[in-house]
């Protein structure tokens, strides 16, 4: 302690582990727990951080990197389940913290949880797309009300990198190995 010195805290996060708690503390929000699945489809209670009309989903809490690393079997489906839960609860602004996730499916799993249907070249449905299914996806079908539903919503994605998804410096090439890609 030093006389005349004032200490102020400033919550900061890179969009990974702890992002939701950081934001909910700074915004004086609440934490709700919703039914979801982890990146391998196991049922979990995942935190949904909320304040005002905002719901924050922390991928590091829902689909976190795990000891078992199987990027081909990992999916963002649980993130989509949380989005659906938040939509059903009436939220319109969504912040998704992308850091610390264990999947690399381009969001296909999350879209499937929101009703987008994915099919392979034989017309066979791929109900819960994973990273390994991306090469099999030939066609997708977006529900007729999907575009109307998302028109009134605002999405913010929080991360500390600017990598595109594909290419030499893409997220798949750069971050895939930490998630189990070889």
Predicted regions mapped to residue ranges:
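Glycine-rich loops and low-complexity Gly/Arg-rich segments
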Residues: 2, 32-36, 80-82, 120-122, ...
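Glycine-rich nucleotide/cofactor/substrate-binding loop typically near the N-terminus or early
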Residues: 2-66, 155-165, 172
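Catalytic cores of large soluble enzymes that bind and process phosphate-bearing ligands
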Residues: 11, 15, 71-75, 178-181
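Gly/Ser/Thr-rich loops at beta-strand to alpha-helix junctions
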Residues: 13-15, 98-106, 163
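Short acidic, glycine/serine/threonine-rich loops at helix termini
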Residues: 20-21, 106-111, 115, 166-171
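Hydrophobic alpha-helical hairpins/lids featuring a short glycine-rich hinge
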Residues: 43-97, 102
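Glycine/threonine-rich beta-strand-loop-alpha-helix active-site module
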Residues: 74-84, 88-95, 102-154
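A structural signal for small-residue-enriched, beta-sheet-centric alpha/beta enzyme cores
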Residues: 132-147, 158-180
